[in-house]
Structure formats: structure tokens, C-alpha cells
């Protein structure tokens, strides 16, 4: 009589992660766009300095439990240090030094043509936490069809920029220790057929969504030339879903490659609030491509045209002082078509490419932006040569 071992493999390990970031916002002279600033002994320059340090110790156990599947256990000890060095008269703390401990469990099991998996991630301290629970199944059904279904729930504290920020600019100093944790529930589905077709979708419910917004509210007729950015949390839950379809249809030497995405957000906006998570309702990208082999199959070429389009929406813009994107409900961008031409060639170890971007810019109007304050580039031509000396 024989007895199969319940554990086929077992391994212990340790991992150490150290991360260091230094951010320095410098201006020879402060500008009015960010509002008034502190002038120390007549010094009107801006030199805001911040440092972020992460130290993470990870102890893990990986095991294969035979019929029960693969189980991985981890324990993390995390220390953060986020400090500011600024010339400011505001009486606020200059650093955050939190610590956190976490337990993680990952399980995966293969049964026939299906893979099942489960993730559990919990923080032992109540502040600066990040919790997750998720499960999913993926596999094949019928011939050449694949699917993936997942469900997950997240709870996480806002990042450090929302909690503490210091600057020589008077309007950009805050300490918000009582922000609520964000909570996200998500389900997703992905179905594909060979490399020809892929359909995916997801549905999210978000509570306490945390974002930067303009202090003025255009929905109430307010306007602020300084466009001051402040931390904010949504009062009501936000529901967001999207459906994406990708297809690659070969027709002889031609290929039709199409991507279309529909997305929608449902948010009850209270008086004084802004509409957050603003996205274009429709996004589409369509390519017609010709591929061929010439000169006794020694030369490969690809050439074609790509069309891009998205509907209007309130796009976020980048604020360099806080290094974050800011939500605005003042200016919409979008609804401009963009055509790109490309040509690629390869012979042995040499590749050549030419790309003409936004070739329709001169005759389709000039109302095109990549964000509310940054025009999208006009027609541009890029070309290059790649030569590999060794195969």
C-alpha cells in the first residue's frame, strides 16, 4: 500500500524592497498661476523639496499541496517616510512616518481546462491600509474560445499627497489625517476567440473616491483664474462600467484591426461637488494594414492607415506643483478625428520605419487638445533605422 505525499514542494524565502524618490519643484521666481507665495528675506524663488522612502521586508512560503493546488503565504513589514523641506510660514507637520504589517494568501488550482485562483490581502493596522479579496476562473470552452471571470473588493487609504502636502505657495499646504478609505467592488469578464476577436467588460462600484479638484465649481457658475487644486472625496458612490471589443480580421494580404470601447459613469453630483472619473463615452481605433513579402521573401513590409477618435469629455489636467492630475468641469476636449500613416520594412537584420502622425491636421480644424490646456501636436513625421549586427 502506498500513500501519496500531500506536499510535493515547499520553499521559504525572504525579499527586501527599498525605494527612494526625490521630487524638487524649482522656479527662479514664483508665478501668480499658483497664487501667493511666502517671500523669505526677499527671496522670491521656489525650491520645494520632498523625499519618499519605502522599506519593505517580505517573508514568504510557497507550497504545492498536490490535489489542493498551489498556496503562497506572505508576511510584510512596511515602513514609509515622506518628508518635505520648504520655506513656509504655515504651522503644519513636515513628514509622515507610518508603518504597516500585512498578511497575503494566494491560491491557484488547475482542474481539467480551468484555472481557479483566490487572493487575500489584509493590513493588520487600521491606518494607511490596503486590503483586497479576489477570486476568478479562467479556461477554455468549445474550440479556440478562452474566458476569464474575476471578482474583487478593495479597501485602501488615499496616497500621501492627499493627506499631507507642503509648499512655499500658500494655497498648497494641507494636512488631512481623517480622510476615509476608498472602497472598490469590481467584476470583470473577458472572452476571446483565437487572435481574431476579444470582448471584455467590467463593472465597478466606488465609495469615497479621492481626487484633486479645482476649488471653483463651474457647475455653480464659479471661476478661479488661479485654478487652485485641493484634495476632495466624493460624497456619493460612483458606478463605472466599460465594454471593449477588439477584432483582427485578415483578408488576403490586408488586415482590418478595430478596437471600440464604450464606457459610462453614474454619479449623483451634490451641490458644490464636481463630476469625477470623467471619461469619453466612446473610444475607437481602426487600422487598415497591408502586409507582404517581396524579393523572394527576403523583404517584409507593412503599411497602412490608422484612425483614432473619442467623444468629448471633461479631461483631467496635470498640475506640476503637486505632480498629480486635477479634475475640472470647465472645458471639454474630444470629437476630433486623427489619421496616422505608417510604413515598416525589414530585410535580414535591418528594420526601417516611417510614421506620419496627425496627417489630417491642416484640413480638419484646429480644435484638438490632449488636455484642456495643451493642444495636440500638428502633423509630424518620424522615421528610423534599426540595424542589428548579430542575430
Predicted segments with their positions:
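Exposed, low-structure sequence patches enriched in small/polar residues
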Residues: 1-30, 38-391
